[in-house]
C-alpha cells in the first residue's frame, strides 16, 4: 500500500510471497480486488442536482478574509478551466469578517468627520478645527504602528477598538486646543497661549488618559475566553489614547502657536446664553444639594433593577443571509425513502421567495463529533455511518444579499412553514450568525444536568425535569437525549463462571474488542491512475456475527481439589449469554457520578437567564418535596452557566480597574478626597448606560459590559478636569461656590465638545443596521448614553459633592505674575476682578 498503480489489475497482480515448489503467490490468488462505487452512501445535492460539498478550513496563522478571497479566486480559475463545472459558496465566514471590517472602517471615517464638525461649531473657526483634525490621522497612524510591532492583526475586534478610539482620541486635543484658544481670546500672544494653555491642562490630560488606559490592565488577569476576546480591543483603545496624548501635548500646541498667530477668536453668543442659564441652574443645585443626589441614586437603582430583569446573554446574535436546516427523517425508513424525503425538504426550501441556493448533505456527526474525522478503521466508520447518517441531514440555505434583518427573519419563517408540511420528518430552521460558532462552544440555550446513581433513576428523574421545563414559560422541546435508545446486543457475563475458568472480565472484554476491531484495516489509501482511493479489507471467511462471536475461544486455567492445574479452552457461550434490547447513549460521568443532560429551546422573545431563575425555583421545590430520589440532584448549565462565568469575569475586571483609576487620580490631585468626588461619576455613567439599554430594548452581553468598562476610564476625565480647575481657582483666592460656578462655565465647552465627539463617533455603530452594528451596538449604546448622562451629571453632581466635602478654604494662595513666560495666566484673579466690578464678591466659606 502507498504505491501508485495504473489499474486495478496491477493491484491484483501484486506479489505477496514466493513459495518453494509452488511459485509466486499474488494478491489475486487469495483475494478479489474491485472498485466499488460508494457515492450512494451519502446524499449530496445542490439546488436539486447531484453535487459534492467541500469544507475548507484555514490554519491558525492565516487571515480568514485572505483565505476566503484566495479560495474564490481559485474557484473562478477552476470554472474557466473545466467545462460544466459550477461552484457555489453556501457559507463563507471570511465574507462576514470582510463586511464587518468595511462597516467599522466606514464608522471610523464618519465618526472622524462628525468630530471635526463639532469642533467647527463650538470654536467657530477653521484654524483650530484643522489643528485637531490633523491629530486624528496622526494618532491612528501611531496606533497602527504600535499594533504592528506588538503583533496585532487588523480584524473585527482590533478595528472595533480603533473605531472606539476615533471618538476618544480627539478628547485630549480638544481640551488642549480649547484652552489655548480661550487664552488667545483674552489677548495672550499665540506662543505664550500655546505653552501656558498646555501647561494649565497638561496634568489633567495625562491623568485622564492614564485612567482611560488603566481600566484595561485587569484583562491580563481574566480567564482565557475573556482575555482572548477583549485583549486585542483593549490594546487598540490603549494605543489610540496614548498616541492622542503624545500628539495633544506636542503637535497640537506647536501647530496652534503658528496657526493662531493672526487668529481673531469669535464669540459664540448662543453658547454664552447657554452658559448663563447653566450657571443659574448650578447655583440652584448648590442651594438644594440633597435633591440632585437623591435623584441620581434613585435612577441608578431603578435602571439596574430593570435591566437585570430584562436578562443577560453571552454575545449578541448577528444575522446574515445564511440559514441552516437540521433535518431528521422518521425511523424505519429505507435509505431510498429517507433520501426522497430529504429531497422534498430541500426543494420546499428552494421554492421559498428570496432563497437563491440550497445545498444538502448527509449529517455524519454523532454527539457533536464528525465520524469521518475520528481516525477509525473504515469498516467501523461505515457501521457508525449506517446507523447514524441515513436519516440525518444538514441543509445550507443562501438567501438574497439585499435582504434586511426583518426580511431575513420572514424568509426563515416561510421556510419553516414550508418544510413543516412534509410528513415523516422533523426539521429545524435556524439563521446562521457570525457569533454562532463561538456561542456553540459556550453551550447556549437551556441545559440542566441531572445527577444520579443508576441509569433507571436518571431516566425517571430526567423525565420529571423535562416535564418541569416544558411547563415553564419560555421553554419548549425539552429532551434528555435518551430517546427510545438504539437497538443493542446486550452481553451478560457470568462472573462466577469466568472465575471458575481462571479468567477475568477484563480478559474477556479485551479479546472481544480485538475480534471486533480486526475485521477492518484501512489506514493507507492507494492511488490508481491518478485517483486516490480508500482501501476496505473484508474477511468473508470469518465474518462477525452474533453466532460466531459466541463461539469465540478463550484459553482457560482450571485448578482441581488436589491442586492440579489443567489448561483448556472455553467459548464465550460457556461464560456469557446475549439478548437484544435498547440502551441509552447519553448517560455520561462527571467526578465518578453519572448524569443526564436535559436541554430545551428558548422561545423567541424570552431570555434564557430570566426564565432560568423561574425554572430554578421549580427545581428547588421538586427537590424539597421529597419526590426526587435520594442521591439525585440538578444543576443549571448551558447558557446560564456560561453567562454566569462571563458576568463574574467582567465584574472582577471592573472591581480591579476601580483601584487603578483611584490611584491615578490620587497621584494627580495629591489628595484622597478629590478622587472620591470624581469617582462618583462612575455610577452615574452606569445609570446612563443601563437606561440606554432599557430604552432601546438591548440586553446585557459581553460586548455591552465592555462598554461599561470603557466608561469607567472615560467618564472620570471630565470630572478630573472640573475638579482640577476648581482647585486652581480656589488656590488663586476664589470663594468655593463662586469657583464652582466659574469652573462650570469655563469647562462647559470642552466637556461638551469631548462628549459630543465621542458620542457622534459611536452613532454610526448604532443606526447603520449592518453586521458591525449588530455586533457593537450594545457597547455603543452604553457608551453614548452613559457618557451623555454622566456629562450632564458631572456639571451638577460633581460641584454639589465638592461643595459638601470641601469645607476648608485653601491653605496656599498664589496669585502668580504675568511677567514670566512660564507662569500660568491668573484665571482666578480675572474672575475675582470681574466679581468686584459687578459687586458680587463673597467671603471665603
Give the role of each language-model region.
Residues 313-396, 417, 455-488, 836:
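Extracytoplasmic/periplasmic
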Residues 97, 101, 177, 182-210, ...:
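Helix-loop junctions and hydrophobic alpha-helical segments within the transmembrane domains
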Residues 201, 267-316, 448, 825-835, ...:
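Signature of alpha-helical transmembrane segments and their immediate interfacial
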Residues 3-5, 18, 148-153, 220-228, ...:
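Transmembrane helices with small-residue packing motifs
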Residues 1-4, 340-441, 497-510, 514-517:
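Solvent-exposed, membrane-proximal periplasmic/extracellular interface segments of envelope transport
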Residues 113-182, 660-747, 752-768, 785, ...:
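Hydrophobic transmembrane alpha-helices and their membrane-interface caps
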Residues 166-178, 202-221, 228-266, 395, ...:
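Transmembrane alpha-helices and their membrane-interface boundaries in multi-pass membrane transporters
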Residues 1-113, 120, 177, 428, ...:
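Extracytoplasmic/periplasmic membrane-proximal domains and adjacent transmembrane bundles
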Amino acid at each position: 500500500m502507498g504505491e501508485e498503480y495504473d489499474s486495478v489489475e496491477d493491484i491484483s497482480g501484486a506479489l505477496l510471497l514466493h513459495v518453494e515448489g509452488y511459485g509466486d503467490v499474488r494478491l489475486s490468488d487469495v483475494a478479489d480486488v474491485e472498485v466499488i462505487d460508494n457515492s450512494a452512501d451519502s446524499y449530496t445535492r445542490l439546488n436539486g442536482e447531484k453535487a459534492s460539498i467541500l469544507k475548507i478550513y484555514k490554519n491558525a496563522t492565516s487571515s480568514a478574509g485572505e483565505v476566503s478571497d484566495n479560495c474564490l479566486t481559485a474557484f473562478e480559475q477552476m470554472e474557466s478551466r473545466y467545462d460544466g463545472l459550477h461552484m457555489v459558496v453556501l457559507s463563507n465566514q471570511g465574507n462576514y469578517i470582510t463586511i464587518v471590517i468595511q462597516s467599522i472602517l466606514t464608522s471610523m471615517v464618519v465618526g472622524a468627520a462628525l468630530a471635526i464638525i463639532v469642533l467647527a461649531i463650538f470654536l467657530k473657526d477653521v484654524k483650530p478645527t484643522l489643528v485637531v483634525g490633523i491629530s486624528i490621522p496622526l494618532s491612528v497612524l501611531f496606533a497602527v504602528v504600535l499594533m504592528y510591532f506588538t503583533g496585532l492583526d487588523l480584524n473585527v475586534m482590533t478595528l472595533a477598538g480603533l473605531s472606539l478610539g476615533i471618538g476618544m482620541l480627539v478628547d485630549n486635543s480638544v481640551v488642549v486646543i480649547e484652552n489655548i484658544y480661550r487664552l488667545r481670546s483674552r489677548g495672550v500672544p499665540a506662543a505664550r497661549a500655546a505653552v501656558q494653555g498646555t501647561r494649565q491642562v497638561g496634568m489633567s490630560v495625562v491623568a485622564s488618559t492614564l485612567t482611560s488606559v488603566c481600566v484595561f490592565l485587569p484583562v491580563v488577569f481574566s480567564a482565557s475566553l475573556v482575555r482572548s476576546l477583549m485583549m486585542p480591543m483593549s490594546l487598540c483603545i490603549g494605543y489610540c489614547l496614548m498616541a492622542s496624548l503624545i500628539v495633544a501635548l506636542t503637535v497640537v500646541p506647536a501647530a496652534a502657536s503658528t496657526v493662531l498667530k493672526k487668529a481673531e477668536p469669535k464669540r459664540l453668543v448662543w453658547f454664552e446664553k447657554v452658559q448663563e442659564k447653566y450657571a443659574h441652574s448650578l447655583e440652584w443645585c448648590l442651594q438644594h444639594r440633597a435633591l440632585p443626589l437623591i435623584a441620581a441614586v434613585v435612577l441608578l437603582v431603578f435602571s439596574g433593577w430593570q435591566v437585570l430583569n430584562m436578562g443577560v446573554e453571552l454575545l449578541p446574535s448577528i444575522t446574515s443571509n445564511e440559514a441552516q436546516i437540521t433535518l431528521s427523517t422518521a425511523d424505519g425508513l429505507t435509505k431510498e425513502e429517507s433520501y426522497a424525503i430529504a429531497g422534498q425538504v430541500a426543494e420546499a426550501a428552494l421554492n421559498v421567495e428570496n432563497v437563491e441556493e440550497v445545498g444538502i448533505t448527509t449529517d455524519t456527526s454523532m454527539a457533536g463529533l464528525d465520524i469521518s474525522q475520528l481516525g477509525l478503521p473504515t469498516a467501523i466508520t461505515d457501521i457508525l455511518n449506517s446507523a447514524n447518517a441515513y436519516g440525518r441531514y444538514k441543509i445550507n440555505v443562501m438567501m438574497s444579499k439585499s435582504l434586511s434583518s426583518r426580511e431575513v427573519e420572514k424568509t426563515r419563517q416561510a421556510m419553516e412553514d414550508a418544510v413543516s408540511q412534509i410528513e415523516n420528518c422533523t426539521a429545524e430552521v435556524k439563521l446562521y450568525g457570525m457569533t454562532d460558532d463561538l456561542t456553540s462552544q459556550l453551550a447556549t440555550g437551556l441545559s440542566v444536568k441531572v445527577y444520579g446513581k443508576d441509569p433507571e433513576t436518571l431516566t425517571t428523574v430526567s423525565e420529571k425535569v423535562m416535564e418541569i421545563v416544558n411547563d415553564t414559560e419560555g421553554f419548549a422541546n425539552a429532551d434528555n437525549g435518551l430517546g427510545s435508545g438504539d437497538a443493542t446486543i446486550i452481553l451478560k457475563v457470568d462472573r462466577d463462571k469466568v472465575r471458575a475458568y481462571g479468567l477475568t472480565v477484563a480478559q474477556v472484554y479485551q479479546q472481544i474488542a480485538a475480534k471486533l476491531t480486526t475485521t477492518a484495516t484501512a489506514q493507507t489509501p492507494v492511488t490508481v491512475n491518478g485517483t486516490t482511493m480508500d482501501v476496505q479489507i473484508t474477511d468473508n471467511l470469518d465474518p462477525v456475527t452474533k453466532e460466531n462471536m459466541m463461539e469465540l475461544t478463550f484459553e482457560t486455567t482450571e485448578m482441581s481439589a488436589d491442586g492440579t492445574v489443567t489448561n483448556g479452552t472455553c467459548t464465550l457461550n460457556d461464560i456469557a449469554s446475549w439478548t437484544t434490547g435498547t440502551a441509552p447513549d447519553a448517560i455520561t460521568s462527571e467526578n465518578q457520578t453519572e448524569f443526564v443532560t436535559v436541554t430545551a429551546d428558548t422561545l423567541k422573545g424570552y431570555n434564557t437567564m430570566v426564565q432560568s431563575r423561574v425554572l430554578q425555583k421549580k427545581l428547588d421545590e421538586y427537590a424539597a418535596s421529597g419526590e426526587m430520589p435520594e442521591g439525585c440532584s440538578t444543576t443549571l448549565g448551558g447558557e446560564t452557566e456560561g453567562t454566569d462565568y462571563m458576568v463574574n469575569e467582567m465584574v472582577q475586571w471592573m472591581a480591579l480597574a476601580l483601584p487603578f483609576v483611584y490611584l491615578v487620580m490620587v497621584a494627580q490631585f495629591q489628595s484622597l478626597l478629590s478622587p472620591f468626588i470624581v469617582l462618583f461619576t462612575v455610577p452615574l455613567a452606569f445609570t446612563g448606560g443601563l437606561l440606554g439599554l432599557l430604552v432601546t430594548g438591548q440586553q446585557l452581553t459581553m460586548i455591552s459590559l465592555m462598554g461599561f468598562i470603557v466608561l469607567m476610564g472615560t467618564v472620570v476625565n471630565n470630572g478630573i478636569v472640573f475638579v482640577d480647575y476648581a482647585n486652581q481657582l480656589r488656590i488663586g483666592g476664589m470663594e468655593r461656590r463662586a469657583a464652582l460656578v466659574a469652573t462650570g462655565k469655563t469647562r462647559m465647552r470642552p466637556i461638551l465638545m469631548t462628549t459630543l465627539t465621542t458620542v457622534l463617533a459611536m452613532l454610526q455603530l448604532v443606526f447603520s443596521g449592518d453586521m458591525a452594528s449588530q455586533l457593537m451596538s450594545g457597547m455603543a449604546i452604553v457608551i453614548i448614553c452613559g457618557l451623555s448622562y454622566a456629562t450632564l451629571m458631572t456639571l451638577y453632581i460633581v460641584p454639589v459633592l465638592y461643595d459638601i466635602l470641601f469645607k476648608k478654604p485653601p491653605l496656599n494662595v498664589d496669585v502668580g505674575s504675568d511677567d514670566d513666560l512660564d507662569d500660568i495666566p491668573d484665571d482666578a484673579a480675572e474672575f475675582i476682578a470681574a466679581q468686584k466690578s459687578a459687586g458680587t464678591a463673597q467671603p471665603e466659606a
